[in-house]
Structure formats: structure tokens, C-alpha cells
From Swiss-Prot:
<dbReference type="InterPro" id="IPR036869">
    <property type="entry name" value="J_dom_sf"/>
</dbReference>
<dbReference type="InterPro" id="IPR001623">
    <property type="entry name" value="DnaJ_domain"/>
</dbReference>
<protein>
    <recommendedName>
        <fullName>Uncharacterized J domain-containing protein DjlB</fullName>
    </recommendedName>
</protein>
<keyword id="KW-0143">Chaperone</keyword>
<feature type="domain" description="J">
    <location>
        <begin position="3"/>
        <end position="70"/>
    </location>
</feature>
Length: 475
């Protein structure tokens, strides 16, 4: 065929790669179903060009001296994978698979694992598309003839079943180089998350511009990955909010919304919602968000918040608070050691932290030096609880009155309620005594014994009234 170079639209050459690229470029224009004659001529031109290239000195074809040309199905498959516009389209893959219907059973058996090998060696492969070919050729059901390593095949089929990290169709409008770079980034992202999560923060810390495809599965994964690393991704704040609104029963949705709002640095406008979330969905994750927000915006609340979290966790099987000395849990001490080095923590907060961490030793800064601090009443009650002392009515009444103050913040209200519960629980436990043994009736002579009884009755009335006020607040 003397006009093979004209059909391939290239100059005469002995470079097989140039001939093959020219053939692959023209192949989509001559489909065997829509233009069988054109496809036949193109195929003949390709084979003739290969013969000439492999033996340019000979004008007569001698087939025994040349390699057998690759099957047109394999060439069509390579062309599909190389197509910038069709490689991720299921419809294009369906058209390719229809070509297999023209092959005999013997040809299908020969092509089955060759096609699988080509797919396995393709860097950017849509599993949504290749699963169509896997089902048609029964890669999972048919016995491997040994052409492919069994473990590699099993791993490949598992990856197909798992699916891509996102739908590659969403980036087909981008330049090919950007498509490939985006796929590489997110595939590596998913690999690190599943195999080496400790490297996640380091990987995300790399400064680079990355496309975020419009894919809900990817968006949710990104929210999970970034939140796990305590990193912000402001581009997905709107999606996180819409996720919570569309799936109100999904407990993950509000967490990722509030997590991103915290890590993006939202301040006072978030506090009320965050406190409500902490009450409605108690968890260590919610605790971490509250602590992170405090450390960013109201660091002096941090020690009190740590104590509040500890008190909420220490309950019995009936959910009733246990009597304990604050600061003994390892988690509490860890959080307090973290905040001790924070320069923004006031002397008042630092003194309470040192008191909790170094029991039996006097803190370097006296708690009484900051009586003008707005949180002084709360810290005073917290100090008494840390020292295992019964809070006095004089120390409790100021924080009770703060609950009705117009300028108190939601976090302050949470802390006050928890301090009052601890104080009430402390009072109840203190009044529990062993069963008394029979004793001779004391003689009421108006002396110190009578005065002691009067004092006991007085304190019982005081604390009974205080407990009544607390119950009224929570009723």
C-alpha cells in the first residue's frame, strides 16, 4: 500500500512510535461500526507502515521477519486510555466494550488478561469505568492464566471495588496536566490517611495550589482528614453547613461544621452554638473543640473548662456525680500542663493550674491577688473544690447571681452550673455519716454542746436553701 503514509498523515519514517501515535490519533475517527471501510483502510495503512519501518531496505513484505501487529482491540483500548476527553467517561468505555462483541470466544480468552495488564499499568484510571470492563471480561471469576501476579491482581480488583477517591469526570474540563496532578494529590492523600496518618499534617503543610473537585464523597473525606489534623479548609465551610442542614440526623455533619469553624478561627459568633453542641453531643471530640476555641479566644476560661469536662465525666452508673478531688485524672493534668506554658493565661488562671498540678505546694502566685478579675468568683469556688473544702454560701452566691446577668456568656453559664452541681454534690456527701451507735443522751446544760447543735442546724438550713436554689435553676 503505497499511500499508507498519506492515510496516516505523516512523513515516511522508520520510527515505530511515531507510526503508532499517528494510528492511535486517527483511530477514534474511524470507528468499526460507523465507518468499517475507513477503519479497514486505516488498519491496513498502519500494518503496511510497520512493515516498511521494520525493513526499510526491502520493498517486498516478508511476514516471517516482522512482529505480529498488536490486536486492534488492544490498540483501541490504549487509544481510549490516552484520550483526554473520553478516558473517564463510562459511555466511551461502553462503546469500546461493544467492540468485544465482534470478537470470537478464543479472541476474548486471548485478550482478557492483556487488557487487564494494560489497565493495571495505567497511572490515572477511572475505577468507575474499568469496573465495566472487569464485569464484561469476568476478571474476578475467570482463572488467572499466570500472565499476571496473583497478589497484584487481587490488589487491583480490590482497588476497583473500593473506587476512586473522587469522580474523575468532575475534572475532565481541566487541562490534562492539571487533571493528572489533581488525581495524584488526592490519591496520595488517601494513601497516607489509610496507611500513615501520622504523616498527614506534614503532607498538608506543603504549600501548593490544589483543585477541589465538585464531589460530595471527596468533600466529606477532606473535612474528616483536615479536622483530624486540626487544620482549616475554609473552602468547604459552606458545604459543611449544607451537609448538616440536609442530614440533621447525621451526628458527623455538625461535628465537622463546628470543627472547621473553630479551626478557621471563628470567634464569639460561634460560642453559643458550640456550647449547645457540647451539651447535646457529649464526646471527647466536642471537648477538644471547646478547649481549642477557649485557647484561641478566652484562654482564662480554659482551666475552668478542663475542670468542667472532668466533672461531667466522673459519674456513677446512674449518671449521678461522684465525689472526687479535681485534677486527679491523667486527661485533666495533660490539658493543664498544655495551658501552663501559654503566655496569654492570666496570673489567676496560672495559680489555679499550679494548685491542681502541684497539690500540697503553694502556687508561686497567690489566687487572692486577682480579686478584681471578672472570673474571680468562679476561680474562688474552683479553688475550694480543688482543696477538697466545702464551698461557702458567700462564695457561691456571687456565681449564682451571675447566671441571671445579661452580660454573661454561654460558656460562663455552663461552668457555673457545673460548679454548683459539684458544690451541691459535695454538700450531700459531707452529710452522709456512718450509722450512729447508741450513746447516752447528753445533758443540755446550755454549754458548748448546745452551741454546736445550733451551729449544725444553722448550716443545714443554709445548705438546704442553697440546694433548693440550685434545683430551681436546673428545674
Amino acid at each position: 500500500m503505497k499511500n499508507c503514509w498519506k492515510i496516516l498523515d505523516i512523513e515516511e519514517t522508520t520510527d515505530v512510535d511515531i507510526i503508532r501515535r499517528a494510528y492511535l490519533a486517527l483511530l477514534p475517527s474511524f470507528h468499526p461500526e460507523t465507518d468499517p471501510q475507513g477503519f479497514k483502510q486505516l488498519r491496513q495503512a498502519y500494518e503496511e507502515a510497520l512493515r516498511i519501518a521494520q525493513s526499510p531496505a526491502k520493498s517486498v513484505w516478508q511476514p516471517e521477519e516482522y512482529e505480529v501487529a498488536e490486536h486492534e482491540i488492544l490498540l483501541a483500548f490504549r487509544a481510549l486510555l490516552a484520550s483526554d476527553s473520553e478516558r473517564f467517561l463510562p459511555s466511551a468505555w461502553q462503546r469500546f466494550i461493544q467492540q468485544l462483541n465482534y470478537c470470537s470466544m478464543e479472541e476474548i480468552d486471548e485478550l482478557r488478561w492483556s487488557l487487564c495488564t494494560i489497565a493495571m499499568n495505567t497511572a490515572h484510571l477511572s475505577f468507575e469505568c474499568v469496573v465495566l470492563l472487569a464485569e464484561r471480561l469476568r476478571w474476578l471469576q475467570e482463572e488467572n492464566t499466570g500472565e499476571i501476579d496473583e497478589e497484584e491482581l487481587e490488589s487491583f480488583l480490590y482497588a476497583i471495588a473500593k473506587g476512586n477517591v473522587f469522580n474523575f469526570q468532575t475534572i475532565l474540563h481541566l487541562p490534562v496536566a492539571v487533571q493528572n496532578d489533581t488525581i495524584d494529590f488526592y490519591q496520595m492523600f488517601a494513601r497516607i490517611w489509610s496507611s500513615h496518618p501520622q504523616w498527614l499534617t506534614l503532607y498538608l503543610a506543603q504549600h501548593r495550589a490544589v483543585i477541589i473537585p465538585d464531589d460530595a464523597k471527596l468533600h466529606r473525606n477532606l473535612l474528616r482528614w483536615y479536622s483530624a489534623g486540626r487544620l482549616d479548609i475554609p473552602e468547604l465551610l459552606d458545604y459543611a453547613q449544607s451537609w448538616r442542614e440536609t442530614e440533621p440526623d447525621n451526628e458527623d455533619a455538625p461535628y465537622y461544621e463546628y470543627a472547621q469553624r473553630v479551626y478557621c478561627g471563628e470567634g464569639e459568633s460561634l460560642l453559643a452554638e458550640l456550647c449547645d453542641y457540647w451539651r447535646e453531643y457529649p464526646s471527647t471530640q466536642a471537648d477538644a473543640l471547646m478547649l481549642q476555641w477557649c485557647r484561641q479566644h478566652r484562654v482564662d476560661y480554659y482551666p475552668l473548662l478542663v475542670m468542667m469536662i472532668e466533672a461531667r465525666d466522673l459519674v456513677n452508673d446512674q449518671g449521678k456525680p461522684l465525689l472526687y478531688v479535681p485534677g486527679d485524672s491523667a486527661r485533666t493534668r495533660f490539658h493543664l500542663y498544655e495551658i501552663l506554658s501559654d503566655e496569654k493565661l492570666s496570673a489567676l488562671g496560672r495559680s489555679l493550674v499550679e494548685m491542681v498540678l502541684h497539690k500540697g505546694r503553694k502556687p508561686r502566685i497567690s489566687l487572692t491577688r486577682d480579686t478584681e478579675h471578672t472570673l474571680w468568683p468562679l476561680y474562688l469556688v474552683a479553688k475550694q473544690l480543688v482543696q477538697a473544702c466545702q464551698p461557702t454560701e458567700e462564695s457561691l452566691m456571687p456565681i449564682v447571681s451571675r447566671l441571671d446577668a445579661e452580660n454573661r456568656c454561654p460558656l460562663e453559664a455552663l461552668i457555673i452550673r457545673r460548679l454548683l452541681i459539684q458544690a451541691a454534690n459535695f454538700t450531700e456527701k459531707q452529710t452522709v455519716e456512718p450509722e450512729p451507735q447508741p450513746q447516752p443522751m447528753p445533758v443540755d446544760d446550755g454549754g458548748p454542746g448546745c452551741l454546736g447543735i445550733i451551729k449544725i442546724i444553722f448550716y443545714i438550713f443554709i445548705f438546704a436553701g442553697l440546694i433548693g436554689k440550685i434545683l430551681h435553676l436546673f428545674g
